[in-house]
């Protein structure tokens, strides 16, 4: 759906969309906006987005895709759900985990000992129900909205990916605006970002309570063990040029 929206923006049928991960298909540097075990917490995410590398990512969106980011919004940490508690990477052995169709997800979970299985999100609930897969990973909002509490007992707080997205407008559409309207548009985007962050934080606490009320058991995990095992594999999968960018991100976000 996201790729279709991008196509329609290029055709001039629609003007705006929201990114959710598909941008990584267009340029290698964009993979850093959706990479497991890269960032340790939300503060690190904010540091990356507002750094020179974050601005480079935004420039690449304009150059390679023809889409201009209008600020960013938090999507929450991705956590692993399962029907057995997962506290350490050792508990993952042979666990069949649904992942998005993104190489870094496959590389990371395979390195941790699991069996990552790329699958469309629309197929996840029924596959969990039927036992085709045993686990999946998503932010609280996606876990709640998809009803995964009906087919998964444990919510393991891996926080393995700090996710964000971008409200996007077609660059051609943006450049067609008069100068004064561009300024108003960008100011509105800044106000939207502040408002969204406030809504996000409020919603996260509500979602956790709702998921617990639905019977999910929250499990604290050894985050350091997950990070150490996962990030090395992701790093090794990158090109030499992107490995240098990775190192820079780690310095920025410490």
Q: Whereabouts are the PLM-identified features?
A:
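Short beta-strand-centered segments that line the small-molecule binding cleft or hinge
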Residues: 47
């Amino acid at each position: 759906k996201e790729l279709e929206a991008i196509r329609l923006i290029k055709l001039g049928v629609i003007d705006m969309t929201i990114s959710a991960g598909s941008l990584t298909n267009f340029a290698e540097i964009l993979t850093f906006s959706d990479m497991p075990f890269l960032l340790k917490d939300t503060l690190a995410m904010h540091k990356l987005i507002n750094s020179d590398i974050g601005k480079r990512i935004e420039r690449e969106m304009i150059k390679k895709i023809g889409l201009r980011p209008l600020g960013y919004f938090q999507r929450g940490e991705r956590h692993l759900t399962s029907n057995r508690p997962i506290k350490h990477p050792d508990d993952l052995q042979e666990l069949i985990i649904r992942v998005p169709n993104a190489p870094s997800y496959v590389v990371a979970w395979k390195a941790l000992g699991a069996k990552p299985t790329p699958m469309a999100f629309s197929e996840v609930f029924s596959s969990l129900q039927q036992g085709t897969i045993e686990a999946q990973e998503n932010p609280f909002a996606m876990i709640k909205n998809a009803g995964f509490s009906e087919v998964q007992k444990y919510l393991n707080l891996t926080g393995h990916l700090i996710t964000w997205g971008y409200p996007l407008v077609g660059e051609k559409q943006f450049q067609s605006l008069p100068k004064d309207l561009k300024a108003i548009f960008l100011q509105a985007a800044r106000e939207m970002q502040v408002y969204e962050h406030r809504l996000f934080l409020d919603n996260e606490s509500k979602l956790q309570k709702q998921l617990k009320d639905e019977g999910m058991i929250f499990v604290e995990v050894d985050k350091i063990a997950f990070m150490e095992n996962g990030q090395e594999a992701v790093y090794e999968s990158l090109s030499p040029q992107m490995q240098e960018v990775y190192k820079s991100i780690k310095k920025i976000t410490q």
